[in-house]
Amino acid sequence: MATVSGRRRKRKIQLSKLFTLTGAKACFKPDHSKIGRSGFSRVVFCNQPDSPEAESRNYCDNYVRTTKYTLATFLPKSLFEQFRRVANFYFLVVGILSFTPLAPYTAVSAIVPLTFVILATMFKEGVEDWRRKQQDIEVNNRKVRVHRGNGNFDLREWKTLRVGDILKVEKNEFFPADLVLLSSSYEDAVCYVETMNLDGETNLKLKQGLEVTLSLREELNFRDFEAFIKCEDPNANLYSFVGTMDLKGEKYPLSPQQLLLRGSKLRNTDYIYGVVIFTGPDTKVVQNSTDPPSKRSMIERKMDKIIYLMFLMVFSLAFFGSVLFGIWTRDDFQNGVMERWYLKPDDSSIFFDPKRAPMAAIYHFLTALMLNSYFIPISLYVSIEIVKVLQSIFINQDIHMYYEEADKPAHARTSNLNEELGQVGTILSDKTGTLTCNSMEFIKCSIAGTAYGRGVTEVEMAMDKRKGSALVNQSNGNSTEDAVAAEPAVKGFNFRDERIMDGNWVTETHADVIQKFFQLLAVCHTVIPEVDEDTGKISYEAESPDEAAFVIAARELGFEFFTRTQTTISVRELDLVTGERVERLYSVLNVLEFSSSKKRMSVIVQDQDGKLLLLCKGADSVMFERLSESGRKYEKETRDHVNEYADAGLRTLILAYRELDENEYEVFTERISEAKNSVSADREALIDEVTEKIEKNLVLLGATAVEDKLQNGVPDCINKLAQAGIKIWVLTGDKMETAINIGFACSLLRRDMKQIIINLETPEIQQLEKSGEKDAIAALKENVLHQITSGKAQLKASGGNAKAFALIIDGKSLAYALEEDMKGIFLELAIGCASVICCRSSPKQKALVTRLVKTGSGQTTLAIGDGANDVGMLQEADIGVGISGVEGMQAVMSSDIAIAQFRYLERLLLVHGHWCYRRISKMICYFFYKNITFGFTLFLYEAYTSFSATPAYNDWYLSLYSVFFTSLPVICLGIFDQDVSAPFCLKFPVLYQEGVQNLLFSWRRILSWMFHGFCSAIIIFFLCKTSLESQAFNHEGKTAGRDILGGTMYTCVVWVVSLQMVLTISYFTLIQHVVVWGSVVIWYLFLMVYGSLPIRMSTDAYMVFLEALAPAPSYWITTLFVVLSTMMPYFIFSAIQMRFFPMSHGTVQLLRYEDQCSNSGNFEMGRQGSVRPTLVMRSHQPES
């Protein structure tokens, strides 16, 4: 009877799903209540895309466009983008006004600089969009085989595909649209899919078509094929799909198991047939391609405020001048005669009419706005964009951040945040795969209450060092360092214990439990074996490194998983009775997948004896409560071992199983099928509810312990970042004991730190939590508040010495701490500690903590992670850094900057961050300095001429100042300048605090640069005016006019701003010499060439240099005297600052030049908490 029923059951589950639960059958009554309603209204006419019903649906075509512009929209849309910037819009208004009689200069000279800047930016946008267009053309013109009718398949371009088309996709081809899988080259319609382009995961996914479409394996089979698919509307969820297929009058449920997404690739399968259900913009990959969160750096936001301040100043000066002009114009008419007779207006002009002084003042206000526009640096935005792009290239090309082993360089995915890298105050880091390698090694296990495995972990080594002892590796007598440094012979397996290796487990007291333990490891997984055709060796494609480590461990200990079909798993193992190796076949009935909410996975299998087994593995927090009363025999010993493993920094899982009777399984099958057939958005919740009822009453087998080793250089990197004054938070899903010990191993925690631990894991609290009553929840919250308050009291009692404290909090406590009424006090405590570790954190909690730190502390936050569960945290932080590690590329694709190893963060921040912050800060300050120096000389000259709105300079002098004579040096400053070299940045991390405290872009520093510009303009104007106004300019006795005074002042301005650039630059390259001195040379060449043009073109600059300025000694003497006088205040200020108020970089520069840096003891940098890091020159300290 058992045999008959077993056969019946085998036939029934012949095509059950591997990655989902048991396949649904048409014999069950499905719930189609949602189909046809909002969100579930799509109807696909399979193999009938030309039918009137299909065409009436008006589904979009399959052309995918990633460009920002089209040919028709490029000009208006790009112009709109440019003139959204207030500065550009202001210059546009000024350009329009320059065509009116109000303009103090010609319209062409006003339009040319704006046109140059706008065209340069549009050119950059156009080139970038053209590259995207070329990529679009390449993708849309790819070809795929499409059913044309009568069983014939022809090649067609992707862009021509329509909903309902039947496609044949062959091995290693990408899917051109979202398809429902019908059949494949395998008899059971299985295919393997690589989804790296979607979620970054490199492991293969297994998909399978419905049983009813298995026979469609030949092209001719589609000649008469017709079906209807009703499914959900287009959406961005990659991991869900709800629909039904109506075929021959029967309805069959569709799930993600049948969905093949555009952008994924067919692997290890000769071909598949599928029907198009979503095209072009409706495909899930395009639905997911939304713009990432817009992030702007702190400096960029502050720069906008400076622009508004400059506008206020421009309007104030224009208003001030207009009022005075109106008063002087009104008072100009005395006794019927105009005092300034030469300004007498004609009948058509009121600009200087004393009888209409108010109107003249209003017109003058508009004229003054145009004249004062030179205070605003027109090329600021485009120059910064150019600089940031080139800075990003330098980051990408840094050989010191290139990970040769994986061939992965650093990649700045956006250039908007370069300077933000130099201002990070808090780093929030994931642990697994970020601080650690995410390359798991099976190192210990507990079976039947007995601990196995004699290896020594990195955490144990760190504990030894803290205790000052020398632990010896028990397995071979080597020292701890040797044990950790030794590479395992088999990747993923670092287990040493002769009691169960080499088949010795059969002699152990609990050999039967050991056998079940490793059988579970060999069977309970979703791993795909791959056989090398040349060597015959088996490798494993696993969804996670843990899974691979378990399968490898089972193989190395005698239980080799070697073959998987859709419905079976084959294992070679040692028979406990005969002692011989045998092959055992397990029929896979169901796979209950792992999820972060369940924290476990199970498989239901049938062994060769006909037994139904549920094999389960999961976190201890959920597994122990699911044990039956009779299955807790080894619970106490296993709990103790799990705690010991956690103390050693190991990741643990509990293994358990149970036998199912046939009736129970039949009930489960019926209920799970009903849940699967529920075509609604909450289908997954219904499935979880059913699986919850069968994953219970388990029998404990033991626990696994795998080690995730720290990446190279992590402790040194963290120590260096801490010396730079950066606080580091670790947000991990690990147990508290594991997280604490990893913290010690990576130098996040130190022996002299006092740990403030907040948790809700005590037995009393757990008992209270189980009651679930409102009073109990309130008590839990009150307990967390009490622990936080107590921690703050400890911190206060220590005098606020953050260096002495570390905060460790578990996930349950964190949930309460992040509530609105408690997060403020929690943040105060956390900020007061040097290090923070959040354990058992969910992805949502990681994002919420990041948001709390970013908004609550006011500091720049950087989040770093490597997995999909870190995406929210990366997007929430000011800067998201993705680690291109083992868990795929999803974190990288959501990040702002990608690096291959955590240790590269040290160079990214302390070198590139520091340099970029200094460069951008100095660049912006210098921009405003040079424009104020130039613009204020115009204002002073206008005031000198009774606000007559006459510019001191020729029109083209005005136009070319910002975009030609002074732009290249400041761009080179932003690209090449270094206050100290990279080795010194790393040697003296205190330099980084200049960015964290924003010393170089504070309002004090900005206003001081502006004041310096005003002073320079005043000195230039008055010295030039005084030197030239009351004496003959040359030997012919000619006095200086506007052309000579303007030319002389302009020369002085060019020299002064160029020399100021020389004094601002800390690190000269040949390029900088060329552009700085070349700017001065080009000014003189321009004077000669432009002045030599016909007078109708050169106007008042005609021959001014060759005939007036160059032959006159007074011009050269005045220029020399004025330039030196203008630079003298800056020399004096710099000398005083260097001598009495040196900044950190100045001190390092001084020591470098004095050759004192050869001795590392000259500087002492200690790890700091919340206080500012201090730089101590030991050589300058008096000896005691």
Swiss-Prot record:
Chief localisation class: membrane
GO cellular component, one term: membrane
Reactions this protein catalyses: ATP + H2O + phospholipidSide 1 = ADP + phosphate + phospholipidSide 2
Topological region Cytoplasmic: 1-75, 125-306, 383-921, 976-1005, 1065-1070, 1134-1184
Transmembrane spans: 76-97, 102-124, 307-328, 365-382, 922-941, 956-975, 1006-1028, 1042-1064, 1071-1091, 1109-1133
EC number(s) on file: 7.6.2.1
Gene Ontology terms, MF aspect: ATP binding; ATP hydrolysis activity; ATPase-coupled intramembrane lipid transporter activity; magnesium ion binding
Extracellular side stretches: 98-101, 329-364, 942-955, 1029-1041, 1092-1108
Places the protein is found: Membrane
Topology class, membrane: Multi-pass membrane protein
Amino acids binding Mg(2+): 866, 870
Keywords: ATP-binding, Magnesium, Membrane, Metal-binding, Nucleotide-binding, Translocase, Transmembrane, Transmembrane helix
Primary role: Involved in transport of phospholipids.
Protein name: Probable phospholipid-transporting ATPase 12
Organism: Arabidopsis thaliana
